[in-house]
């Protein structure tokens, strides 16, 4: 184990140029290429990221701005959230604020449509 620690210490002290030269020497000696595993790893890492985007099923509806028709937006927020008039007004006044969280895509789109029809600016996150 002590030998491995010494090797690790020596490798850590190499400059970038020395490390690149060492890679070339080892590739020639062992008959391998360091480029192929890197490309495979990069392709493998991209696939889970694409799956994560496709798997998003719950959204957060965020009111970013009330717009010119603030009274209409307050009414819609009141209806959507079930809050009282004062609480709905406070929520609209403090935009950007989440209106609904953990909602399905179809429901989030419906809520967004209602708020935008009332004049609000809305984002889905």
Swiss-Prot record:
One Gene Ontology biological process: translation
Keywords: Ribonucleoprotein, Ribosomal protein
Gene Ontology molecular functions: mRNA binding; structural constituent of ribosome
Endpoints of the signal sequence: none
InterPro entries: Ribosomal_bL12 (IPR000206), Ribosomal_bL12_C (IPR013823), Ribosomal_bL12_C/ClpS-like (IPR014719), Ribosomal_bL12_oligo (IPR008932), Ribosomal_bL12_oligo_N_sf (IPR036235)
GO annotation, cellular component aspect: cytoplasm; ribonucleoprotein complex; ribosome
NCBIfam families (alphabetical): L12
Similarity comment: Belongs to the bacterial ribosomal protein bL12 family.
Protein name as catalogued: Large ribosomal subunit protein bL12
